[in-house]
Amino acid sequence: MINWDNFYVFATLSVGLWLAGAVFALRSSTRSRMAVGFTIAGIMVLGIFIAGLWEYLQRPPLRTMGETRLWYSFFMGIAGLLTYIRWKYRWILSFSTLLSTVFVVINLLKPEIHDQSLMPALQSVWFIPHVTVYMFSYSVLGCAFIIAVTGLFCHKEEYLQTADNLVYAGVAFLSIGMLLGSLWAKEAWGNYWSWDPKETWAVITWMGYLIYIHLRLFGRVGSKSLYVLLIFSFLALQMCWYGVNYLPAAQQSIHLYLSLIHISEPTRRTPI
């Protein structure tokens, strides 16, 4: 039976396979089959753990912050692999592996409480698609962040085209996630939008990326400014995901999850 006690085994194996894939990618001047194979294997290992944890908990592992970090690492591996296959950047797997590993290590050092309870509001048809679509969009935009940082410090203006494609895809999924969330909110709480702190930061993040898209389509802005905008938009995304939970104003948010067993059921919230 796969449970959270087994996570260190799957995490170590996944990260090891991803690192091997990154090394093969860096050592090859063309797209490496070994890099693709090792990366896919790492993704599959983490996917098996997620599926096993889902079976063990008898609920989708999407409720706690630790569980969303797990999905982020999984989707980050996929996003990095797709970027490598499409644009053949040898270094992208190294950075996507690093970003995935950071969240894996956080989960190893600060595991959440993973029980089987699921508050009534989370027992909704919108729960799984809303959270998974959001986490996939975060991962795609994470790759755009990697491209932006590399383009900024290596003075590679041509990377903007790749960043554009990643932002288009990421914002599309982000918008779908927001739409699904609003439908879920209407069903659970009677309002499509309540402007609580996390929702406010979601709009800030969304607007940051929309400004980037509009500047690329209609503006005459230098590549350095555009890369900086992408970096700050990604930082806003991190604030929306977990940073806002540390703000005093967020304590009454309908999205806040307090992962303590003794907390009463009405105060439990989803992390997205």
Each predicted region: which residue ranges?
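Hydrophobic transmembrane alpha-helical segments in integral membrane proteins
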Residues: 1-19, 129-141
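Membrane-embedded alpha-helical transmembrane segments of multi-pass integral membrane proteins
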Residues: 17-24, 41-52, 73-80, 99-106, ...
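C-terminal ends of transmembrane alpha-helices
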Residues: 44-55, 101-129, 151, 171-189, ...
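Glycine/small-residue-rich hydrophobic helix-like segments
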Residues: 174-224
